[in-house]
Amino acid sequence: MKTLIVILSFIFFSLNFTLNSQEISLHEQFNGRYDFTAIGNTLNLVENNSSTNCTILTGSSANLELEPTQNITAAYLYWAGSGAGDFSVNLNASIITPDRTFSFTYSSKLFFAGFKDVTQIVQSQGIGSYELTNLDEIDISEAYCSTGTNFAGWAIVVIYQDNNLPLNQVNVYDGLQAVPEAISIQLNNLNVVDVIGSKIGFIAWEGDSSLAVNESLKMNNVLLSNPPLNPETNAFNGTNSFTGESNLFNMDIDVYNIENTISTGDTSALIQLTSGQDLVMVNNIVTVLNSQLPDATII
């Protein structure tokens, strides 16, 4: 198989809406003995689709755990929420303003996300607790509360180097797109020499565990799942694959093993996301493929 096709399918609850967003594209590529992990947390006290309580916290924390052999190479902070935007937050003792911002409009309602390269902060602190605070400009008005679209959360994607790893190609993509827009990302000049350890991960906002109408994740027309966290019919359900959490209300930090859907010798990859009912905003995608490329050149 020379082309890798990933299809993320969701079902959207209305066909009468207006969508504006930024296309997901390659942000950075790492070639060598690299892998990734991710941490983060929601600010929602409950799933927004299951309660009339629209109160949202202004901060939350998560722990970064790494093995002694895993050395931090890069760290990227993403935060998002309902409303026009909050672009001044705190990560532990550091004031954070975004390097880039993203916006999305759905049925006249605004949503936002911010991105910050926090490599120096995370390299300096290392493992331990990270707390994002001062995310206090979230719109929880009736327009959002009554439609179950009020949310806020944050995540840090950490790329690390470990001499015990095989030679991998780690691609980090970002933007802010929501279903039902189709997303196509063509990856050329790949060199998959072994399928062991191949995986795809994503950070997505606003998914509901209670809305699961034909949600699916497919690769080469094969349904992927990570039971019990991510069943075939409910990919975006407020879970974290790294910690096993199932109460990450209205956000997902999920990873799927794709060893059985790719083959040694694959030279290109087409990642596609298509639409569904549950409002889901995809902010970040990470792929890990075994590769012999020796440097960090973007291809």
Predicted segments, located by residue:
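Bacterial Sec-dependent N-terminal signal peptides
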Residues: M1-E23
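Disulfide-rich extracellular domains of secreted proteins
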Residues: S21-P294
